[in-house]
């Protein structure tokens, strides 16, 4: 059995450190995707309240105030913010993949939520954030996000997990129809790295789609220089602008929609032909990103 499914990948700047504004933004984008006929919309990693880029700034004096604000503007699974987003998904009859910072007690986690068109939610925490991410986020136990839906089997992983053979291999063997590769966007301190992380992430997404033989949505955040109020702190030189590299890929790893400019905000939209009744064995996963 095959079905045509319109999907949307978000490329947008988060509402930094403002959970209320972030929820309003997510609901607005859900409504915009629905109005374009999408049945699934995917958001970047930790889109609420934004990825904590100050980790790259090597500014220890920022950590106290910003970290406290980050915790305060993270969401709880049973809180009113996620309930509002779930209600929007149900009202619009759309599936939503959302990366967010989950607050539990005095810790925060890099979490992925999959909300179906009835508003039912499944949440999974990133088990092993990168070394730098662990300066903010906790580690967790439990499986990655994988769920049967009316659109087929949907799975989600965050960011650097796509470079780990163990993390992606288990997902691929499950026979995903649609994979959500939730990237945070890409901007670094100038001179800190010669690696083009945006190119690496796109290569990793293509590799994953080919190995899993699944469709892949790769939402990313736009991170302008004003992100984290860097300019106000006299540090306007530390962040690059732009950084959005949202993609929608076919099982062959090729683009199904023309990518937006790196600093452009909006929705990338494409139609997928999903064969939900046919099992597609995954190919072996590698921990190297290949174009």
Region spans (language model):
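Active-site-proximal beta-strand elements of phosphoester/diester hydrolases
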Residues: 4-14, 111, 123, 152-161, ...
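Active-site glycine-rich loop that binds ribose-phosphate moieties when present
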Residues: 128-147, 160-166
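A short, polar/charged loop-to-alpha-helix boundary motif
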Residues: 125-140, 263-283
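Cysteine/selenocysteine-centered motifs that mediate thiol-based redox chemistry or coordinate metal-sulfur cofactors
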Residues: 146-177, 181, 277-291
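Cys-nucleophile CN-hydrolase/nitrilase-fold catalytic domain and related Cys-dependent amidase chemistry
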Residues: 19, 31-117, 186-203, 207-214
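N-terminal glycine-/serine-/threonine-rich phosphate-binding loop
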Residues: 1-40
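CN hydrolase (nitrilase-like) catalytic-core segments centered on the catalytic cysteine
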Residues: 77-95, 159-266
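Short beta-strand scaffold segments in enzyme catalytic cores
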Residues: 98-100, 110-114, 145, 246-248, ...
